[in-house]
Amino acid sequence: MSKIIGIDLGTTNSAVAVLEGGEAKIIPNPEGARTTPSVVGFKNGERQVGEVAKRAAITNPNTISSIKRYMGTNHKETIEGKDYSPQEISAIILQYLKSYAEDYLGETVDKAVITVPAYFNDAQRQATKDAGKIAGLEVERIINEPTAAALAYGMDKTETDQTILVFDLGGGTFDVSILELGDGVFEVHSTAGDNELGGDDFDKKIIDYLVAEFKKDNGVDLSQDKMALQRLKDAAEKAKKDLSGVTSTQISLPFITAGEAGPLHLEVTLTRAKFDELTHDLVERTIAPTRQALKDANLSASDIDQVILVGGSTRIPAVQETIKKELGKEPHKGVNPDEVVAMGAAIQGGVITGDVKDVVLLDVTPLSLGIETMGGVMTPLIERNTTIPTSKSQTFSTAADNQPAVDIHVLQGERPMAKDNKTLGRFQLADIPPAPRGIPQIEVLFDIDKNGIVTVRAKDLGTGKEQNIVIKSSSGLTDEEIEKMVQDAEANAEEDKKNKENAELRNNADQLVFTVDKTLKELEGKIDEEEVKKAEAARDELQEALKGEDFDAIKEKTESLNEIVQNLSVKLYEQAAAEQQAAGGAEGQEAPQNDDVVDAEFEEVNDDDKENK
């Protein structure tokens, strides 16, 4: 069975890992980094992903970051006249991760386990699965990020029973999960979180502060300047990271904008105390979900054996201090918060392929599922924190006499009224025979698979007629749309590959021109004028071809010049060998004059040499 890669598709950064020799290993990207910024840029029809796109963001307005925040919504990004869904942008990132994983492994990769925040709803999970499909990946499993982290942490600790709290504060989402580890079983007891809290929000607090300070000092509002905002965003992220290690950092952005008197510069010293003050409300928002997870698991803080930190934002000292205060224990520092999720996903891939044995993962659904009933009430069928996969049915009836159809409004959430919860979908069970209100028996069955994706079925028990749907939100893509996006992604991948090959061809040709100039200089006066002219003519032809976009011509001229260069190199080698031989001969001639004693053989050679002369 081919390898299944593990992917942490993050808001800010993404990572990919694979199981090798029973151990999960992070695959470095082409730049050598172990995580890749979740940033996509478009420029003149070309796509850039990762660090390259992030660096160019200051000057390229067609740059998209933190797209994960929009998964499962109708959000569209319009770039160069084309609309992109969050699934398509995520697929571009996945495609990049897939491509360098293939380079590392030396084989095609078409299967993956992708992680999502535990608190992602059905629409967001479905969107993630669709993104994988568009990228050419068969998503074997969608796994919750805290659960993946626990897998990576607990793989070598299955001998002892432990209760673990995973505190996952990433770039855009926050989750807390409580798991029980023992005898190779990873059982999730509860999960809670906030899908709109993460490192990006901490950055924004710094940006808002810098904008306010600059306006106060200079009377200029930087929030209206796109390029200045991008520079502020980069500076804020760097300052946040710096303040995890030092108590004060200098933010210096020369020529940030221009005023009436000329260029203006931003110089601000940000202390950790000020940063903590600015972000206090964000840190406080992590407490309620932590308490909720403990309450749902029927545990107190003292029952927790180990606290695992996941996500780069858990490096913020105030966050660590809050966890310590809330749970009464020092968080475990033995895992890399940026890499542990992808590693856990790779381990789950190993469980699927059979490379990892005796490990059972029992995950839960993060939110209650139900339907709208009379009076606009949400009636739950599956309570939150139910172990998945699972299915549950309940029988309902009609609300009016001779009601011909029943509308099934599928909901996800914890609020008592239907309107306050997330609508997953609607469908209708029609052709119900005329009967008094309350007589027809309508069975509604909810089924949640191992990926947390929901199917709902409604059946008229009297007639046996049934209707079912795999839940897709209003933002969900149709199979046709996904197929078209898959084809577009494949075409783009082919184009990207071609562009890369053409860039390499151009670089090699440039290098060859440089080599020819160097070689001709070294051979000056040592080879025929005819040879020199031939090489120069071929070089000039290649330089001319390099001015255009005809890559076949560049290839042809490169090959011709290469052949000439090889012949010249042979001549250069022969020339050097001849000179060395001549030098050796000269030493031999001088030897009899310098030495009093020479052996007969040596003298004989000299005599021959003299005779030859």
Swiss-Prot record:
Swiss-Prot/TrEMBL keywords: ATP-binding, Chaperone, Nucleotide-binding, Phosphoprotein, Stress response
Regions of compositional bias (Acidic residues) in chain numbering: 596-613
UniProt keyword Cell membrane present: no
Keyword Chaperone: yes
Region annotation Disordered: where it falls in the sequence: 577-613
Top-level taxonomic group: Bacteria
Residues annotated with Phosphothreonine modification: 173
Low complexity bias: start-end ranges: 577-591
One Pfam family per UniProt: HSP70
GO MF entries: ATP binding; ATP-dependent protein folding chaperone; unfolded protein binding
Induction or repression: By stress conditions e.g. heat shock.
Annotated family: Belongs to the heat shock protein 70 family.
Protein function: Acts as a chaperone.
UniProt name for this protein: Chaperone protein DnaK
Originating gene: dnaK
